[in-house]
Amino acid sequence: LSLRRQRQMCIRDRDRTYKNAIELMKSLGVGIKEISIKDACIQHMNDIEHDESVKDITYENTQARERTQILFDMANKHGKLLVGTGDLSELAMGWCTYNGDHMSMYGVNVSVPKTLVRYLVEYVAHESDEKTKEILLDILDTPVSPELLPPDENGKIAQKTEDNIGPYELHDFFLYNFVRFGFDKAKLKRLAQKAFDGTYTNDEIEKWLNVFIKRFFISQFKRSCIPDGPKVGSVSLSSRGDWRMPSDASFEDFIK
């Protein structure tokens, strides 16, 4: 966005990702502000009478929406633009909290699939100084996670996105061929079997294709109200542009 780095503000999460976030911000010379969401989330869960020991979707989304509220309020306070980090793959799969990370003032990555994000980060890493490169490559080596659940007993990330919804390289493949060419389930499966022969079994492809179709259909309501963002490639899910779909469309006929 051609903004001076010193005028950009970043807010962090925890542990390995926390260390990388802090070191990357220092390396890039951007402003750093650390705000804890713990007390606010505990207060909110008390207000709605939710037991904070129950690590369910309410527990997770409370954190996601509190993060977003802080970011919006900080943007208002400083008269700045809240730039969203969500990408095309997350939007397709609905892997975002409605009115949490789903929302921003401008979705700069909204038409960039997750697999391309990785290539872009790797490219920037190799174009950067050694310190920044080291940090970015470690970020690429970190499991994809919203980090809304506590870490495991070793302090490692326990909530891994691809363990829950499947490999992004498969989902991005399904997404491109479904939206760009309108292929049905049978053809998507045949193409994936050819493209990923030796990487995924037929049963794995079938399993994750069913997950993709179901999540894509039931997540349309999130895509019907998203912030503005650029169209980068040949596939876009903006309801104001390339993609129009009723939010109550059923996946059941398509998945047969």
Kindly label every feature range from the protein language model.
Residues 8, 23-31, 40-48, 65, ...:
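Generic, well-ordered alpha-helical scaffold segments in large soluble proteins
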Residues 33, 82-84, 118-119, 126-141, ...:
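Acidic/polar loop patches that form or flank catalytic/metal-binding clefts of enzymes
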Residues 56, 61, 95, 100-105, ...:
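Peripheral terminal appendages
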